[in-house]
Amino acid sequence: MWRDIRLEQEKQLSPLAAHSVDTLGRRLPEEPCKIRSDYERDADRILYSEDFRRLRHKTQVFFNAKSDHICTRMEHVLYVRAISVTIGRTLGLNQDLINAIALGHDVGHAPFGHTGERVLDSCVKKINPAMSFRHEYHSLRVVDRLCERISREKIYERNGLNLTYEVRDGIVSHCGENYDEYILYADKMKDPNLIYETEHRKCMPYTLEACVVRLVDKIAYVGRDIEDAIRAKLIDYKDINPEIKRELGSTNGEMINALVLDLIENSYNTEYIRLSRAKGEALREMILTNNKQIYQSSLLRRYEITAKNAIEGLFEILYENAKNLDRKNKSKTMQRLISYIDEKGYKEDEAPEQIVMDYIAGMTDAYALQTFEDLYWI
């Protein structure tokens, strides 16, 4: 009865929206929830997972910030969710689906932000050039394999959260680091069986809801990163490009407001999620300016050295232990690794570099540093 009421409410959505009754389904079949839609159920599974919980202790941009008000990875995710749901509600899209994709889009991010991602990718490539670390792919791996789901049914063990295809696709297709991209469309020709072959930064999402999250991912961080840089005394408001101020405003709130209104005006009742050329180019210019003034600053370079040393050091010693696994070895390093391997249920033929990559990617900043210090007796 209650589920029927929820599904009836979905009929009020735009014809362009994704409807949960039309989902391409889960990898393993399940009985539907008596109250929630499939997408709402997915959002709850992500929200209550330990992997999501750890995002509050992972870097967005500024590592080991002294201020309590510097943005963390979890805050960024919640900002993306809030902005995306507002847009989705106005466009008549499925808010439950948007909510789930937004909550899960960074759940597999490495510690130390994008620096950690680059270093971890470099480490694994030195061992196995065929492997790589990209946070959007790893986020899919987290929800498909590494997340622990509490269930009395053995069939769901080692199968992650068993999310719907639309949510999984939105997660793996969310990467919005193509700065020239401000027009997105839903690719309904995608083959669900090829989700693990999604091309980095090239494939469009399957739903308009995922397109919203992908574009908002950029909208949510550029202005907030400027705020954090000002709080860290890295830049001043006067350093913001005057042309950007005229087009988008001076504060994070003004920038978000300008971009959200523009996106809604240009996307309403269309098969696209897009910004006007003027706002899209202003967003691109702001990202490029942030790259120069913030992300490549000497302050962040110092952060990067710490992150690089920690991840490279962890990978080196953990890989050697994973490659020569000895359950009789009682060292702290070996026992930590064995505990992780047993917890995740890896098969005996699992590549040691994959195990170590999974292990490090799941660490918070503080845990990675503490483990590094413990292993090297610092």
Label every model-predicted segment.
Residues 85-97:
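Short pre-active-site segment immediately N-terminal to the catalytic Zn-binding motif
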Residues 103-107, 124, 146:
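Acidic, glycine-rich active-site loops and adjacent beta-strand->loop/helix elements
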Residues 1-77, 81-87, 116, 132, ...:
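Histidine-centered, transition-metal-coordinating active-site segments
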Residues 104-112, 220:
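Short active-site segment of divalent metal-dependent hydrolases/proteases
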Residues 94-99, 206-208:
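Short hydrophobic "helix-edge" motifs at membrane interfaces and signal-peptide entry regions
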